[in-house]
C-alpha cells in the first residue's frame, strides 16, 4: 500500500518538479543573449576618419532636372566645380557662388535668363589621391563680398559652414553628388550655403569679369552682384610641389526668371 504524503511533502514535491525546467529554460536564453551581443557592431566615434588601405569612388552625376511653372524655371543638378592640390604651404582660393562660376553647364543654361535665385547649394570634396597623401582641406562661406579673404585656418574656421578634413578622406559624401540615399556621411567633407543669410532673393546674371570690374570701381557696388563665395584652404602637404588630391563638386537647385537672348544678357 502506497505511503500517503503529508500536505507539506506534496507541496515540496510539486515545487521541485517546476524548478528544473525553469532553470534549464533560462540557460539557452542566456546563451542566446551572449551570442546576440557578440554579433553587435562596436560603436565608433562619429567624424573620426581612419586612413583606408584602399579606397575608391565611382562618380556618376545625377541627370539634371528642369521644370517650369508660373513663369519660374527650377533647375537641379550636380557638377564638377574645381580640381584641388596641396603643398607644404597654405594656399587659399575662393569660388564665387553664382551660376557663371558654379559649373560650366549651368553657366551656359543660366545665361538665357536675366535673374536667378539660389534655393540650395552644396559643395562636396571627393578624394582622388592615395591614403598616404599628406594634407588637409578647409572650407567656409563668406556672405559679404566687401570682406577680405582670410589668410589663416584660424580666420577661416570662424566662417559660416566651416568644414575640414584630410585630403584622402571624404568619399562618403558621394551620395550628395549622385543623388543616392545617404546612409553614413559622418566623414563627408561637405558644406551647404545658408540661403537664408543671402542679402536678397533675386540676383542678376553676371560673369566673373563683371564682378571684377565692379570691384575695381567700388567694392560696395560689387557686393549686390554675388550672393556669396566659398573660401578654400589647402595646406599640410609634404612637398613644395603641388600634389593633386581630389575634386570639388557642387550640387544646386536654382530658380530662373525673365528669359532673354544670350547676346542681350549683359
Curated annotation (Swiss-Prot):
GO terms for molecular function: RNA binding; structural molecule activity. Residues 72-257 are annotated as: S domain, virion shell. Keywords: Capsid protein, Disulfide bond, RNA-binding, T=3 icosahedral capsid protein, Virion. Gene3D superfamilies: 2.60.120.20. Residues 258-266 are annotated as: P domain, projecting. Residues 2-71 are annotated as: R domain, interaction with RNA. It comes from the Viruses. Residues 13-51 are annotated as: Disordered. Transmembrane segments: none annotated. Residues 26-37 have a biased composition (Basic residues). Disulfide bonds join 175-182. Pfam families: Viral_coat (PF00729). It is found in: Virion. Its main location: virion. The keyword Mitochondrion does not apply. GO terms for cellular component: T=3 icosahedral viral capsid. The keyword Disulfide bond applies. Capsid protein self-assembles to form an icosahedral capsid with a T=3 symmetry, about 30 nm in diameter, and consisting of 180 capsid proteins. Each icosahedral unit contains three protein subunits (Potential). Belongs to the icosahedral plant coat protein family. This is Capsid protein. It comes from Southern bean mosaic virus (isolate Bean/United States/Arkansas). The lineage of its organism: Viruses, Riboviria, Orthornavirae, Pisuviricota, Pisoniviricetes.
Amino acid at each position: 500500500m502506497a505511503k500517503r504524503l503529508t500536505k507539506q511533502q506534496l507541496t515540496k514535491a510539486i515545487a521541485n518538479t517546476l524548478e528544473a525546467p525553469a532553470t534549464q529554460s533560462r540557460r539557452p536564453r542566456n546563451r542566446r543573449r551572449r551570442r546576440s551581443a557578440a554579433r553587435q557592431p562596436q560603436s565608433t566615434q562619429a567624424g573620426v576618419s581612419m586612413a583606408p588601405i584602399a579606397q575608391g569612388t565611382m562618380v556618376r552625376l545625377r541627370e539634371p532636372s528642369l521644370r517650369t511653372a508660373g513663369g519660374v524655371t527650377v533647375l537641379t543638378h550636380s557638377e564638377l566645380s574645381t580640381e584641388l592640390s596641396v603643398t607644404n604651404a597654405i594656399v587659399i582660393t575662393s569660388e564665387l557662388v553664382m551660376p557663371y562660376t558654379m559649373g560650366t553647364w549651368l553657366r551656359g543654361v543660366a545665361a538665357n535668363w536675366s535673374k536667378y535665385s539660389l534655393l540650395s547649394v552644396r559643395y562636396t570634396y571627393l578624394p582622388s589621391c592615395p591614403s598616404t597623401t599628406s594634407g588637409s582641406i578647409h572650407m567656409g562661406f563668406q556672405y559679404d563680398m566687401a570682406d577680405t579673404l582670410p589668410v589663416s585656418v584660424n580666420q577661416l574656421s570662424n566662417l559660416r559652414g566651416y568644414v575640414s578634413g584630410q585630403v584622402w578622406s571624404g568619399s562618403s559624401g558621394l551620395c550628395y553628388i549622385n543623388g543616392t540615399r545617404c546612409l553614413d556621411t559622418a566623414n563627408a567633407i561637405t558644406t551647404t550655403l545658408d540661403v537664408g543669410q543671402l542679402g536678397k532673393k533675386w540676383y542678376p546674371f553676371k560673369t566673373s569679369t563683371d564682378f571684377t570690374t565692379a570691384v575695381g570701381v567700388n567694392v560696395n557696388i560689387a557686393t549686390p552682384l554675388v550672393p556669396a563665395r566659398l573660401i578654400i584652404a589647402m595646406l599640410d602637404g609634404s612637398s613644395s610641389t603641388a600634389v593633386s588630391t581630389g575634386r570639388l563638386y557642387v550640387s544646386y537647385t536654382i530658380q530662373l526668371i525673365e528669359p532673354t537672348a544670350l547676346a542681350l544678357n549683359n
